[in-house]
Design a protein with these regions (language model features):
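Short, surface-exposed beta-strand/loop "edge" segments at domain boundaries and coil↔beta transitions
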Residues: 13-19, 31-33, 82-83, 110, ...
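Acidic, proline/glycine-rich low-complexity IDRs
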Residues: 103-148
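Structural alpha-beta junctions
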Residues: 1-2, 27-33, 127-136
């Protein structure tokens, strides 16, 4: 694993009802299934962990219904296909998951990946569109807890 483990950025107050989040997820991998924990302002998903894995289309439906992700943690499907308990950065990097997306208020993002190429791809996508874009390295980790 390389030194770059993630990226953080702000979406400059885009009021897009999760459209930018969907663009980010599709950029990571449009065919990946996602494990979702979320706090949203939509009652059906308030303080919930959605069972199983969602396809990008199913996730888009959830995000369209929720309108605004107050806090959402989305993890790409792990190799074993079984949900694993992820509470810390170390749990994530010891797991089979490849990517973890943390989003607050549909505006602030932290994306962690075991593949540096994924982080660099997201950096190219957000450059010039977002503010406070910062690469996260093993030495400069912003967060140790990955809990929702």
């Amino acid at each position: 694993m390389k030194d770059i483990i993630g990226i953080s950025f702000d979406t400059n107050d885009l009021d897009d009802d999760n459209a930018f989040l969907m663009m980010v997820l599709k950029e990571i991998d449009a065919d990946l299934e996602w494990k979702v924990d979320c706090f949203t302002d939509y009652e059906d998903y308030l303080n919930s962990e959605i069972e199983g894995y969602l396809s990008i289309k199913e996730l888009e439906k959830v995000l369209n219904e929720s309108k605004k992700a107050i806090f959402i943690r989305i993890m790409g499907k792990n190799k074993a296909g079984k949900p694993q308990s992820i509470e810390t950065k170390n749990d994530f990097f010891a797991s089979d998951y490849e990517v973890c997306v943390l989003c607050c208020d549909s505006a602030y993002y932290e994306i962690y990946s075991k593949q540096e190429e994924t982080v660099l791809k997201i950096k190219s996508m957000v450059a010039g569109r977002c503010s406070h874009v910062e690469m996260i390295t093993k030495q400069t980790v912003c967060r140790t807890e990955f809990m929702v």
